[in-house]
């Protein structure tokens, strides 16, 4: 690839000085143990993908509390053992000269009801609306519940910083709890948390304010998926004005970045991508915007160099970062990308398809050469 591409120009993102604009997306992999603690081999997984110095990585979605764990084998950040495991991961990423934000989530009605019931926890959401017709009906969260959740996000953010993270990303996308408040397809409340564009956005805004107060705006990013049609989302009438309002409110908080995601697949079926440019323009050019959604090296370069040339665009990769731990190097050097194996994306507590994708020969040769020069 042309070395003059903006993909390989430095960028300040919050407190992080990135050397390039090829980022790793948050990727749920189900490799944590049954107590939501990262397995020891997760250190190698993240360190591998941090091997190109100056890379920006965001962790898999991480539960803010025991009550918010919607699935088995996803990591958490509510106790000392989890913090300790994450700190070892963050330290290894920093040793590679790269940066790591922890993505925080609560699942709401997207959780597996049986998983919550096994811990005697509520299956709850913004409203008593099932994710699909005939599905489990969640309990509507009370005012007290909502304030408790806002506080728990802030507590989780503080623990993430204690774990050595460079910042946190709020998962406000893909039909999970924050998104369940933002979109009218789920949120049918008539109190201050629903019934209008401003009220539906209130939960996302208040959660963001709480984590900003806890750790600082330059340590906070937010992920949105305005066009996402998974888990019952993307069908509301005022979708564009809803997300334009939310983006404008987030913009005024001075956050480290905004992430905009497109859903490339729904139930194994490829989807046509909607245009996120309206939200990029609303966000503006003063702070970074991360874009993700099935990019390859060619389309990533076009986004950075042509379509969003006037913006601090960072292109985030998911699947290709799974199968190419040296992805930024491969893209810059024009090295072919390895194919990924979908069958091992979500294999619980398994090293297969997790830490066994090889580095390119070219990367290993350059790395070996630089190591020799230091001796």
From Swiss-Prot:
**Which Gene3D superfamilies does the record cross-reference, listed alphabetically?**
Aldolase class I
Q: What is its EC number?
A: 1.3.1.-
Pathway(s) the chain acts in = Alkaloid biosynthesis; ergot alkaloid biosynthesis
In this chain, FMN is annotated as bound at 61, 103, 171, 223, 294, 319
| Keywords attached to this entry | Flavoprotein, FMN, NADP, Oxidoreductase
The cofactor(s) it depends on are:
FMN
Q: Which domain of life is it from?
A: Eukaryota
The UniProt entry annotates the active site at 176
Pfam family for this entry, one: Oxidored_FMN
The reactions it catalyses are:
(1S,4S)-4-[(4-hydroxyphenyl)methyl]-2,5-diazaspiro[bicyclo[3.2.1]octane-6,1'-cyclohexane]-2',5'-dien-4'-one + 2 NADPH + 2 H(+) = (1S,4S)-4-[(4-hydroxyphenyl)methyl]-2,5-diazaspiro[bicyclo[3.2.1]octane-6,1'-cyclohexan]-4'-one + 2 NADP(+)
Q: Name one GO molecular function term.
A: NADPH dehydrogenase activity
The record's PANTHER family line, in alphabetical order, gives:
NADH OXIDOREDUCTASE-RELATED, NADPH DEHYDROGENASE 2-RELATED
Q: Which family does it belong to?
A: Belongs to the NADH:flavin oxidoreductase/NADH oxidase family.
Q: What does this protein do?
A: Aldehyde reductase; part of the gene cluster that mediates the biosynthesis of the alkaloid (-)-FR901483, a potent immunosuppressant that shows efficacy in animal models and a probable inhibitor of purine nucleotide biosynthesis by targeting phosphoribosylpyrophosphate amidotransferase (PPAT). Within the pathway, FrzD reduces the dienone portion of the pathway intermediates to cyclohexanone. The biosynthesis of (-)-FR901483 starts with the condensation of two L-tyrosines to yield (S,S)-dityrosyl-piperazine.
Recorded protein name is Aldehyde reductase FrzD
Q: Which organism is it from?
A: Cladobotryum sp
């Amino acid at each position: 690839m042309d070395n003059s591409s903006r993909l390989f120009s430095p960028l300040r993102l919050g407190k992080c000085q990135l050397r390039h604009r090829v980022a790793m997306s948050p990727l749920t992999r189900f490799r944590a143990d049954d107590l939501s603690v990262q397995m020891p081999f997760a250190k190698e997984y993240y360190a591998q993908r941090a091997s190109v110095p100056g890379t920006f990585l965001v962790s898999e979605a991480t539960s803010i509390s025991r009550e918010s764990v919607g699935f088995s084998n996803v990591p958490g950040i509510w106790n000392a053992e989890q913090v300790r495991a994450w700190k070892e991961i963050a330290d290894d990423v920093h040793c590679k000269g790269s940066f790591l934000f922890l993505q925080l989530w609560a699942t709401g009605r997207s959780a597996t009801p049986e998983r919550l019931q096994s811990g005697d926890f509520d299956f709850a959401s913004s409203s008593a609306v099932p994710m699909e017709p005939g599905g489990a009906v969640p309990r509507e969260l009370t005012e007290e519940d909502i304030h408790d959740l806002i506080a728990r996000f802030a507590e989780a953010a503080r623990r993430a910083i204690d774990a050595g993270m460079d910042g946190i990303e709020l998962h406000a996308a893909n039909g999970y709890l924050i998104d369940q408040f933002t979109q009218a397809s789920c949120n049918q409340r008539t109190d201050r948390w629903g019934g209008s564009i401003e009220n539906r956005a209130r939960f996302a805004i208040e959660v963001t304010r709480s984590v900003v107060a806890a750790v600082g705006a330059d340590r906070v990013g937010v992920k949105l998926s305005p066009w996402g049609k998974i888990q019952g989302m993307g069908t509301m009438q005022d979708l564009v004005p809803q997300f334009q309002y939310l983006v404008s409110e987030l913009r005024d908080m001075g956050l480290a970045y905004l992430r905009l995601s497109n859903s490339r697949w729904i139930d194994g079926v490829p989807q046509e991508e909607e245009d996120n440019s309206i939200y990029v323009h609303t966000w503006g050019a003063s702070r970074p915007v991360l874009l993700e959604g099935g990019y390859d090296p060619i389309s990533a370069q076009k986004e950075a160099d042509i379509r969003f040339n006037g913006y601090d665009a960072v292109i985030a990769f998911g699947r290709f970062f799974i199968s190419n731990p040296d992805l930024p190097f491969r893209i810059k050097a024009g090295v072919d990308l390895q194919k990924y194996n979908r069958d091992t994306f979500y294999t619980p507590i398994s090293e297969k398809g997790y830490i066994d994708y090889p580095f390119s020969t070219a990367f290993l040769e350059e790395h070996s050469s630089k190591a020799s020069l230091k001796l």
